[in-house]
Amino acid sequence: MKRIGVLTSGGDSPGMNAAIRSVVRKAIYHGVEVYGVYHGYAGLIAGNIKKLEVGDVGDIIHRGGTILYTARCPEFKTEEGQKKGIEQLKKHGIEGLVVIGGDGSYQGAKKLTEHGFPCVGVPGTIDNDIPGTDFTIGFDTALNTVIDAIDKIRDTATSHERTYVIEVMGRHAGDIALWSGLAGGAETILIPEADYDMNDVIARLKRGHERGKKHSIIIVAEGVGSGVDFGRQIQEATGFETRVTVLGHVQRGGSPTAFDRVLASRLGARAVELLLEGKGGRCVGIQNNQLVDHDIAEALANKHTIDQRMYALSKELSI
């Protein structure tokens, strides 16, 4: 293999640039040319492809976002769109593709593989919801962003003796809510993977208030429901002054943490190695701090699950 491509797709995550840098430099080190595909699968269909040199990925390891840009592309879900993408890859002489992104990005890589074009998926999403890896690129940075917000909100919650509901990202996965809630000492954590009883949530808040606790932090993953609705219900049921903060897209931005930079560097390099070994249709990950790779179709067939021990611990510590 003498020429490979790299693209980022779906929602951006801090550390994607570090992964791009790793792919480019690892490949060039082994005498392989690298072409960047701009604007994800939409750019692939449009032929928005440019050769990348070592200098093109200099001074980006510390930057959030993605220098290749990203976009969602419904057209690529069609057979016609996939064929257009493959035509562009062949037109540019690209023999293998590294796809950095989440579940939808992996689906695209799987389709290309089924059409006979070798792809390797690299998990890049703040949601940490990709099977086959303990951590995804961007999760640690997003987690630290949320924890920083929790710490600041707790200061004002304490000063004004208020209850605060903080809504975080996670439509289908509660990792951000669970990990940030545990690290931030939240009194209640609500995640999509676990049922909850609103009456129980309110009763726990009242019990805490009765023993002298005048402020509380509640973390709600967006997939559970609207933080604004939860705040309204809590204030109406308890009479406690309640405020709501929806963190939104601030969770996707910022300079990646050291952990995410190292993780991205390791995973990006391993993706290149797999392509050079002739192993397409794979996705890379990290488990027990060891690099692993899986069949991408099998990984997609599995469902991400929450760490039940951590969830149980969060409930034990939030009495």
From Swiss-Prot:
Substrate binds at T125, I126, D127, R162, M169, G170, R171, E222, R243, H249, V250, Q251, R252. Mg(2+) binds at D103. ATP binds at G11, R72, C73, G102, D103, G104, S105. One of its GO terms (cellular component) is 6-phosphofructokinase complex. Pathway: Carbohydrate degradation; glycolysis; D-glyceraldehyde 3-phosphate and glycerone phosphate from D-glucose: step 3/4. The active site is at D127. Its cofactor is Mg(2+). It catalyses: beta-D-fructose 6-phosphate + ATP = beta-D-fructose 1,6-bisphosphate + ADP + H(+). GO terms for biological process: canonical glycolysis; fructose 1,6-bisphosphate metabolic process; fructose 6-phosphate metabolic process. Keywords: Allosteric enzyme, ATP-binding, Cytoplasm, Glycolysis, Kinase, Magnesium, Metal-binding, Nucleotide-binding, Transferase. ADP binds at R21, S22, V23, V24, R25, D59, R154, G185, A186, E187, R211, K213, K214, H215. It is an enzyme of class 2 (transferase). It holds the Pfam family PFK. It comes from the Bacteria. Allosterically activated by ADP and other diphosphonucleosides, and allosterically inhibited by phosphoenolpyruvate. It is found in: Cytoplasm. Gene3D superfamilies: 3.40.50.450, Phosphofructokinase domain. Homotetramer. Belongs to the phosphofructokinase type A (PFKA) family. ATP-dependent PFK group I subfamily. Prokaryotic clade 'B1' sub-subfamily. HAMAP family: Phosphofructokinase_I_B1. In the R state the 6-P group of fructose 6-phosphate (F6P) is bound by His-249 from one chain and Arg-162 and Arg-243 from an adjacent chain. In the T state a conformation change moves Arg-162 away from the substrate. Glu-161 takes its place, hence repelling the phosphate of ATP. Catalyzes the phosphorylation of D-fructose 6-phosphate to fructose 1,6-bisphosphate by ATP, the first committing step of glycolysis. This is ATP-dependent 6-phosphofructokinase. It comes from Geobacillus stearothermophilus.
